[in-house]
Amino acid sequence: MARTKSLSRQIRLARATRGMSVAQVAENVGVTPVSIYYWESGRVRPRDRNLSQLCKVLRLPVRETMALTGR
């Protein structure tokens, strides 16, 4: 649970730092805005493929971000 909260916090902070809306991130990742909301709330963890794309879009370190998923 703590990892999920850390991941959701990291996603939300990176998006805000980049000045991107939920809709912009969703479009660039190839998912719905609802998915981004769920990831940011910690309700759902992104699948590996989506997390990899999210890292590219938000310029997050892939290895460290993947570690937050517990995978």
Predicted regions and their residues:
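N-terminal flexible/basic segments that precede or flank functional cores
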Residues: 1-5, 23, 61, 71
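A short, Lys/Arg-rich alpha-helix, primarily the initiator
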Residues: 1-17
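Residue-level signal for the short linker/turn that defines the boundary of a DNA-recognition helix
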Residues: 9, 19-20, 46-49
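Key DNA-contacting residues within the recognition helix of helix-turn-helix
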Residues: 12, 37-38, 66
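Short alpha-helical DNA-recognition segment
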Residues: 19-38
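DNA major-groove recognition helix of helix-turn-helix/homeodomain DNA-binding modules
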Residues: 30, 49-65
